[in-house]
């Protein structure tokens, strides 16, 4: 069975690569369950080019680049056909725990509603929605519950929801990246999705394992030239430390009095997963090597996100950095998407309880769990 998949907010293709690699063959019937790319949309031109280059080089027109608010949703079906699956990692800017919380009143918060419009128009069998862990605390939990209710009632049939806070380091991603992923299966389907059991809960993949043996001529592997003072400061920061380390001489310390973010000039620890790879932020937020006094290259950042070395990101260095930081780790996505395929194949797989039971979750419960995000 092939699930033809559409995607909004596709970015450079992290979810799409996970879907492309996800496959399951039924042991008794031999039937193959897999996803097939139908169409995708994103507003970022460079991300669209990256997606086209790696996911659908033979069908570049299937990536519609433009503002989702101006997208002709009906024409997608007319041009590319019906879809059985739908994925969307709706923009997280207004829900992130880094910076000001805006939630439903922000510029990006309402964009999830375009995913609901796709569900209303095409009624796919299954959808997967992704957002940052901070979504659960936005607007005192009301944003999260509102989104869940809208998704559950979408389309002709409605959807059975399984929302869960995935800690991707527990699924083989060498990075502490926590994201809410909501899997919805159409209510007329007599199958039930369960959260796949973590694969690496006892032994995380480390930063040093992930960044080993990168070829010098690897794609997107340009090094950053730092000022002498930055190099000297990094030399005084131990692995896992940051710009506020007591070991830094006074003359090399940052002249910042009010805000002290832990990510500033923070070095990776070689024996632990990386901290979260981000797509935005100014100087000092690029992620720093534990041994060499320098920022990580984009290829190193892509490795931490589990993109293969032949996955080429298109655009200038800062544009590539943004794409990588905003993506869903393909390896983590693959595990979740294969669980979806096994669900429809009616195959049992190792699973755990979801963080929230949608039928009974309340705003109060959501707020009580906020401290578990990071």
UniProtKB/Swiss-Prot annotation:
Key words of the record: DNA-binding, Methyltransferase, Restriction system, S-adenosyl-L-methionine, Transferase
EC number annotated for this UniProt entry: 2.1.1.37
GO molecular function, one term: DNA (cytosine-5-)-methyltransferase activity
Catalysis: reaction(s): a 2'-deoxycytidine in DNA + S-adenosyl-L-methionine = a 5-methyl-2'-deoxycytidine in DNA + S-adenosyl-L-homocysteine + H(+)
Pfam family, one: DNA_methylase
Residue ranges of domain SAM-dependent MTase C5-type in the record: 3-347
Domain of life where this protein originates: Bacteria
Keyword Secreted: no
Similarity field: Belongs to the class I-like SAM-binding methyltransferase superfamily. C5-methyltransferase family.
PANTHER family associated with the record: CYTOSINE-SPECIFIC METHYLTRANSFERASE, DNA (CYTOSINE-5)-METHYLTRANSFERASE 1
Protein's name in the database: Type II methyltransferase M.BbvI
Lineage, uppermost ranks: Bacteria, Bacillati, Bacillota, Bacilli, Bacillales
């Amino acid at each position: 069975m092939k699930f033809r998949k559409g995607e909004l907010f596709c970015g450079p293709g992290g979810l799409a690569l996970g879907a492309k690699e996800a496959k399951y063959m039924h042991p008794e019937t031999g039937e193959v369950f897999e996803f097939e790319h139908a169409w995708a949309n994103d507003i970022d031109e460079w991300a669209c080019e990256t997606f086209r280059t790696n996911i659908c080089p033979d069908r570049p027109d299937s990536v519609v680049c433009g503002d989702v608010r101006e997208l002709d949703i009906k024409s997608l079906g007319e041009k590319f056909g019906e879809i059985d699956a739908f994925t969307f990692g709706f923009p997280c800017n207004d829900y992130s725990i880094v910076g000001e919380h805006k939630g439903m009143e922000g510029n990006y918060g309402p964009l999830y509603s375009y995913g609901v419009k796709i569900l209303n128009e095409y009624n796919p069998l299954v959808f997967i929605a992704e957002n940052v862990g901070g979504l659960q605390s936005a607007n005192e939990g009301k944003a999260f519950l509102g989104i869940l209710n809208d998704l559950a009632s979408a389309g002709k049939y409605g959807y059975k929801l399984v929302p869960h806070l995935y800690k991707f380091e527990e699924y083989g991603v060498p990075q502490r990246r926590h994201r809410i992923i909501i899997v919805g299966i159409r209510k007329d389907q007599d199958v039930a999705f369960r959260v796949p059991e973590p694969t690496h809960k006892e032994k995380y993949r480390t930063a040093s394992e992930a960044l080993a043996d990168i070829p010098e001529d690897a794609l997107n592997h340009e090094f950053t030239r730092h000022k002498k003072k930055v190099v000297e400061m990094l030399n005084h920061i131990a692995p896992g430390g940051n710009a506020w380390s007591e070991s830094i001489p006074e003359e090399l310390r940052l002249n910042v009095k009010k805000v002290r973010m832990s990510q500033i000039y923070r070095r990776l620890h070689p024996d632990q997963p990386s901290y979260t790879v981000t797509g935005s932020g100014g100087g000092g937020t690029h992620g720093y090597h534990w041994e060499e006094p320098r920022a990580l290259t984009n290829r190193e950042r892509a490795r931490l996100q589990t993109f293969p070395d032949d996955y080429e990101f298109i655009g200038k260095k800062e544009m590539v950095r943004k794409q990588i930081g905003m993506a869903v780790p393909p390896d983590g996505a693959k595990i979740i998407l294969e669980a979806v395929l096994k669900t429809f194949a009616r195959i049992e797989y190792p699973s755990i309880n979801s963080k929230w039971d949608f039928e009974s979750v309340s705003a109060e419960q959501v707020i009580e769990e906020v401290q578990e995000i990071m």
